[in-house]
Each structure stands twice: as structure tokens, then as C-alpha cells.
Amino acid sequence: MTDARPPREVRAYRAWGAARHLAGGVRDPAFRDLVQRIDGGPLHRCPPVVLLVDGAEAFRVMMQAIDVAREEVLLETYILRDDTLGTSVQQALVRAAARGLRVCVLADAVGSIGTDDDFWRGLTDYGVTVRLFHRVWQHPLEMLRRDHRKLLVCDRALAFTGGMNVGTEYGSSILHYEGAWRDTFVQVEGSVARELAAVFAEGWDRARGPALPGLEYVSWAELDTTPSLQLRVRPPAFPLPFALPHAVQRQLGRRRDRRRGRLVRRVIETATPDDRAVLVLDPRPGRGQREMLGVIAALLGGARERLWITTPYFAPPTRALSLLTAAARRGVDVRLLLPSARTDVPIVRHAAHGAYATLLAAGVRVFEYERATLHAKTMVVDGYASLIGSSNLDFRSFWLNAECNVLVLDGACGAAVDDTFQQDLTTSREITAAAWRARTMPHRLLDAVARGMRWAL
């Protein structure tokens, strides 16, 4: 029994405990070593990260990047619609293929189920290689496992990732299009973009089978004529708390966690902070999920002043909820920005409602965004550590979906996410404990039922 791995939640708790005892929290130089050890991937030094919070501007920048690309364009998305924006992206990809570039599109078969075959032929007939991830009729046993990533990589040097799918509702500014959604993307360069290309390559080879009948299956090895990408190698077991870097292990304090009877190591000596750092987190079923949970737990444990989270689908496991409320109880300014009645999935909103009483009692401030449909997925800790990507705080993102996120350790990016969060609060409504207690009995009943089935949503 002693050789068995502990439950995922316990491993995440270890990461939380290790971060709790860093003197500087997420700003502590040892925090960088901590999250890198949790994930096992490289920590990148890179040019400034650009935050894109307006859909129209984000897609203008991305299509411009496609138009100036010289060798390769890789697009991976959960939803690719055959609407106005989707057609514009299609045309940009066709133009790139006409210039002789290698252009590859990977879309989820369920997310893009409403897209007509003629749209895909409008890509494949002009030299774009397309694959659909896990068609239900081809892979019925894997129906729940979806490719929820959203990323664009150009020449393995410039990349974009975040929460935006390809559809008119994502790509229109809320100032110009009443039905637009509020979402967030980031632009990264250098070695981060190269790793995101490796993420795409891994997803491409997992999407078995061609996009359309009659097309041949083409593996990534057959497509890739440039030097092969070095895919990420993760450690075989969760490394904490016994594998912290030697540089920060010289003076360690130990205390006994009486509740769990486990040793939590405390880092006393730290080094000089480095420059901006970015960590790519790309969990998928069978790999990277516990690392993703560990990094989130470390962010919650490392918060010292404020912890601001934006998520459209909030249905976390009990352990994650307890770590969130623990931060509020120790005096951290914890705020949650969640969707209002304009949500696209009302049942998940009611599942989130089932946790409101616990959150409010712990001192977490809860807001509902009312200006548009909320779809952004961001977390910013102490104005320094920012987590941006496709992952929601729900069971699907934790256990079923392939996701793509970037953890940015940088004050400038943190300040930008902070500013965006505060701007979003100006068009949001705060939920008070008194108002919450006054909700109707049918509302309470629906919240309880949805909360009970949150693992299936």
C-alpha cells in the first residue's frame, strides 16, 4: 500500500502546502522552481506577453499573422463555425496554402458538429490539411474526451492561445456586436510558440482518421518537413514535496500536518528573482491533469494579497473549493467573476450557485458579469502570476478534455489581467449573502440538483 500513488487531491494539497510556506508567495523565486517541478515542462524566458480581450481585435491580429507567415500555420480549436468569421479565417488559411505554406487545421468533431462538410472541402480542396478530433461514430467509447484547446501557431515563432473559438460570437467586439462574448486570448513568441507547436503535433497524432471520407490519413511525421519538435517529457510521478531544487533545499523547515500526518517542507532560503517566465500547461486525459491541478493548488497556496478568477463554468471538485475558501479565510482578497443569466449553459451556472453559500460564508466576493456572455478563463494572483487559457474550473477540464494554458510570471502581464478584471467588474453585479438567502425555493432546488450532478456537466 505504501507504494500506491496518493489521490490526485492529496498531491494537489502537497503543492498547496509547499506554496503556502514560501515567504514571498508567487513572487518568491522558489515559486518558479516549484511550478516547474510540478509540471515537468520547461520554464520559458520570452518577449512580453500580449493580452487580447477584444474579439474583433484578436482575430484581426491573428489573421494578419496568418497572412504574413512564411512557412507554416497551425490552427487547433474546439469550435470552427462556417459563419462569417469562420469563412474569413478559412479564406486566410487558403491564402496561406496558396503561398506554399504547410497549413494544418485540427478541430473537435463534437464542438464543430454543426459545420457543414462543404466548409471542410473549402479548405482541403485548396491544400489545407484538416483533421477532426474523435468523431463520435468512429470513437464511441471516447465520446466524452474532447479537444478543448484553442491555439494558433505561425512559423513556430508566434502563437496565440486562450478561450476563443472560431465563430462570430467570439470575434466581434462587444462595442459593435450585441451578441458578442467576453473572452481572452494571449499572444506569445519565441520558445513558448515552439512548445505550443509541439502541443499541436501531439494533438494531431491523437486525432485518428481524416476529416472527410475519401481523404488519406496523414501523420504528423509525414507532414513535418522541418526539424522535428521535441515533445514534452513529464516526470513519472508527482515530485512534491521531496523533489524541490537543491538550490532551495539547503535550509528547510519541517512541520507536521496533524490532519493528514504528512510532512510539508518549508523553504526558508530563496534566490534572486529572474525575469519574465512562462510555463505551458497542456493537460489531456492520461497525462498532465494532476500537474494542472497541482499548479492551480500552488497558485491558491501562494496567494498573499489577492486572488481574482474569471471563469464561465464553475463546478470544481470539493478539494479545489476548500483550497479556494481557505485563501479567503486567511485574509486574501478572493474574487470570482462568473456568468449571469446570459450564460450559454444555464445548468452549469446553477451548479456554481450550489457553491455560493460556502464561498460567501468564507469571505469570497462573487460577481456575475452582465454585459455579455462570459467565456474568459483567467486567474491572476497578487498582480504577478497569471493563468490564461482554455481550462474551466470544472470536472470536464480537470479530467476529460485536452486543454491548453499558459502560466505567466510577470508583473506587466499581471497588471494587465488585473486591469481587465476590474474593468469587467464595472459591468457586473455583486452577489451578497442577504440577497442569496432570499432566493426562491425552486431556485434553491435547481441549484442543489445541479450541484449534485456537477461531475457530469
What are these regions (language model features)?
Residues 1-298, 302, 326, 340-343, ...:
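N-terminal localization/anchoring segments of enzymes in phospholipid and broader phosphate metabolism
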Residues 352-355:
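Short, glycine/polar-rich helix-capping loops at beta-to-alpha or helix-loop-helix junctions
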Residues 102-103, 333-335:
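Residues at the starts of beta-strands that form the adenosine-phosphate
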